[in-house]
Structure formats: structure tokens, C-alpha cells
Amino acid sequence: HPNALCAGSSEIYIWFKHIQQMYQFGPYGPNHATAGTFAFKRELLKTTKYQEEAALAEEKAFLKDYTIPFVQLEPKKTILVFSHIHNTFDKKKLLEQGENKVQKCSTRTVDEFIKQDDLKKFYSEEIDDLLKNYEPGDPKHKPDVLKQIVEIEERRKKHNQVNSNSRIILNNNGKDIELNN
């Protein structure tokens, strides 16, 4: 695309092995994508960069509040995320939120994403045992990530409290009617 400086996928799929279930996350917006799906022109680096201190959730700043000219990639051809013990962010925490408009169970299968049997076997059966013995990848060795996860969770909790306390009042012929958020 001639006008787009960056491409990526705002819709991603995560395979949760512990429950044998695929989940769809997103899409979140036309100029949004997960950093692991980015492909961008060198020209983009003249106007933006990753924040050195950001250990996760770096997309918003890099994409300048999602204003960078952008093209969406086909999710099935872009990435399949496997939830595992050394994920930078424990993907299982996402399931605690329950389903909503940007997070839902999917009928897609691992076979739709990965055609090679040896790769399917590696990601589905072998990776967890290998990661158990890979001490440097343990999240406890990523203090900056752990700190930022706590900060993000606190901001999200505060945001949810503020929004749950807000009320919308409709005045209908002199009678106030509270609308549910």
C-alpha cells in the first residue's frame, strides 16, 4: 500500500493449550496492531521509535496514538500465539476478563494456522518441557516487565472504578432517568 508506513494485525488468535481452546482478540481499530505482527517501512523510523523504558504494551506510543498510516494484515497469515509459561505477559490472565466484544472463543483451529506437523508437535507438545529448563526465560528474570504489568493493572483498575461511578442522566419531560452504562 503506497500510503501506509506500517502493517500489522489488530486481530490475533491465541491457543490456550491448558483448555484446548482458541480465542480471538480484536480487532481493536484500523490503525492498531500487536507489535509482534508489525512490518514497517524504514521511513517510519524517521518519525517514531520504541520507548526505551517500555517492556510491554509499546504499540500505542510507537504508532503515535494509532495515527500512523496503517494497513491490516490477514490474521490467519500473520501470527498464532501459543500461551506458555514464559510469555512476557501471562496470557491466561486475559481469560479472567471473560468474553466481550474484543475477546471471544473461536472455532478456528491450530491446523488452520500451522501446516507443518513437526511445528505443530513442537508448539503443542514439546515447548513447555523445554521452557521449564530454560531459566533465563522465566518471567522472574524480567523485573521491568513485572513492574509494568502491575502499573498497567493499577491504571486499568482505576479507570474502571472511575467509569463505573459515572452516571448518565436523561431528562424526559422534567423527570430524570438514569441510563445504565
Could you tell me what each predicted segment is?
Residues A54-F62:
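Acidic donor-binding loop at a coil-to-helix junction in glycosyltransferase catalytic cores
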Residues P2-L5, I68, K76:
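Short, high-confidence coil segments that cap the C-terminus of an alpha-helix
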Residues I14, P75-K104:
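Active-site donor/metal-binding and catalytic loop motifs
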Residues T107-N181:
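Terminal low-complexity segments of carbohydrate-biosynthetic enzymes
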Residues Y23-P30:
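Short, P/G- and charge-enriched loop/turn segments at secondary-structure junctions
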Residues F40, E58, L73:
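A conserved hydrophobic position in a structured secondary element of the catalytic/binding core
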Residues H32-K49:
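Conserved nucleotide-sugar donor-binding
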Residues H1-Y23:
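Conserved donor NDP-sugar-binding/catalytic core segment of glycosyltransferases
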